[in-house]
Amino acid sequence: MVDAEFDRVAHDYETQHAAATRLSGEETEFFARYKVQDARHIAAAANCMPTRILDFGSGVGNSVAPLQGEFPTAELTCLDVSAASIDYSRHRNGDGPDYRTYDGHTLPDDLGLFDLVFTACVFHHIPADQHVGILRQLRTRLRPNGLLVLFEHNPWNPLTRHSVDSCPFDVNAVLIDGPEMRRRILAAGFAHCDLRYRLFFPRPLAALRPLERLLTALPLGAQYSLAAR
């Protein structure tokens, strides 16, 4: 994961993302909002009521407003390797969150502990041989009963493949399938990890989206979530 790679695209990220996801019929805000709503439902089902949240790989801050909306009383820390992305997020979202940068390898010692670590489509930008180590560090930053909620692109979905292949800032991305990502999470010391597939229907078929709750085990959704503790 190279900070300069995202420093170069920080101010054009949303335009590039919108172009890459146009086949879905949805705006960038939709993808951030659904993930955070899912995270809230997952946390509630796990009896986890976050007072401190880490947005790991927060980028240009697409998840900040949804996180503040769904968890209005929680303290939010945004952590990313790209200083330009963090600056853009601060300008866009204000000074409410604690904005931090790091070197892409070692989490800052003074981050503290969190009830929820949220990370959205970040690990496909991190070299695979670093995944377990970073996940292990994230685990050590969770409070008792804390929760990791991780979202990633599903490489088994052809539209996802097309979207990633056509996105300039994903040029060096290496997609990870759900079972493999789950193995890495467990290898990092998490005791339990729940895999669910999401985003089966594009906007023209949005009326069918209530059916998705019945399809979470079907490995054809455009993305997936992993909830671990």
Indicate residue ranges for each PLM-predicted region.
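N-terminal, positively charged/glycine-rich alpha-helical extensions of SAM-dependent methyltransferases
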Residues: 1-20
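Conserved alpha-helix/loop element of class I SAM-dependent methyltransferases that forms part
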Residues: 31-49
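Class I SAM-dependent methyltransferase SAM/SAH-binding core
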Residues: 62-106
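A C-terminal cap/extension of S-adenosyl-L-methionine-dependent methyltransferases
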Residues: 99, 193-229
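A conserved beta-strand element that flanks and buttresses the S-adenosyl-L-methionine
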Residues: 118
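A short glycine-rich, Lys/Arg-flanked "PGG" loop and its adjoining helix->strand segment in the class I
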Residues: 132-144
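Conserved beta-strand signature within the Rossmann-like core of class I S-adenosyl-L-methionine
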Residues: 145-152
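Acceptor-substrate binding/catalytic loop of class I
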Residues: 164-180
